Amino acid sequence: MSACAKSRRSDERLREEQTVPMTLHQSAIDVLGAWRPEDPAQDSLRHAVLAFLDTRADACLRECVPGHITASALVLDHDGTHALLTLHPRVGRWLQLGGHCEPSDPTLIAAALREATEESGIDGLTIAPTPAALHVHPVTCSLGVPTRHLDVQFVVRAHAGAQIAVSDESLDLKWWPLAELPDDTDFGLAQLAHAAKLSGLAK
């Protein structure tokens, strides 16, 4: 391959790498911009996250040290009465599924669905396209740097008879009745479950 051809190929690859995060970034702006939460505190937080997205082109990537968008999912069973929770290895608590966005994720919704699928082992999940809640919390990521997760939370539904499979990102998976979540339930999870019930997506 000639030097010119190599240069063109390198330029094309660079453009692709730059385009994918910006598509993800724009989708986060679009999703949060269209969402109208009824809770004033959630709406105020939505505006704050949108302002952060406006100032940081890398806001959806884990390398963004001041904080970054994450995508999580409350995976419900077919009846909407139970939530699939993961026993998180680093936190040591039962949490909803989710995690960091990847540059290959075309949209924020796709990121949440990918995380839910990978961590549950369930194919054919369906996701509500509108966020259920937002939650911001401090965390030290795998990179070892203190940061914040600006977590956009969605509701996902499993098909009847769905079989779960524990991934290497979890110590365990368990279906919990929404009316009997763990005693030490994280505020973000409790808020998400409440929002899912208010929206009619959960029972």
What is each of the regions a protein language model found here?
Residues 81-122, 179:
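Conserved Nudix-box catalytic region and its N-terminal flanking loop in Nudix hydrolases
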Residues 1-8, 203:
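Intrinsic disorder/low-complexity segments enriched in small, polar and charged residues
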Residues 121-162:
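Active-site segment of metal-dependent pyrophosphate-handling enzymes
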Residues 164-195:
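NUDIX/MutT-family hydrolases
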Residues 12-48:
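Alpha-helical and coiled-coil interaction segments, frequently adjacent to or embedded
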Residues 75, 155-157, 174-177:
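Short, well-ordered beta-strand micro-motif
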Residues 36-72:
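Acidic, metal-coordinating catalytic segment for phosphate/diphosphate chemistry
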